[in-house]
């Protein structure tokens, strides 16, 4: 993932989260994330992006509400937890089966997010955690390339 601040690399857990990782891979293949802004930054907690409304001028009031138009069911594995910074997971509404395109990267261990119903972890940052920590609200995702998956 190339951002305004630099490159972030992460591994995707295609074996333990095939639906969620597959959804992310599909969206990347469509260049869905190119030009999308990080619309939520909570220091010490998460950065969040993936809302297509962030590409549309005048739609600031909708930031955080958009998606790809396709929801996926909540997919959890006991092996995949929010136990370290750099956890990559899908954001969703109160409906556990409402994940679509928005994702977040944790800035610290956030194990409370594993409490039922929880959130679908599908990856982990392997390089560029310094970039993750430098992201601010409004920083842009320039492109996302899938080169390999675990």
State each model region's role.
Residues 1-150:
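Cyclophilin-like peptidyl-prolyl cis-trans isomerases
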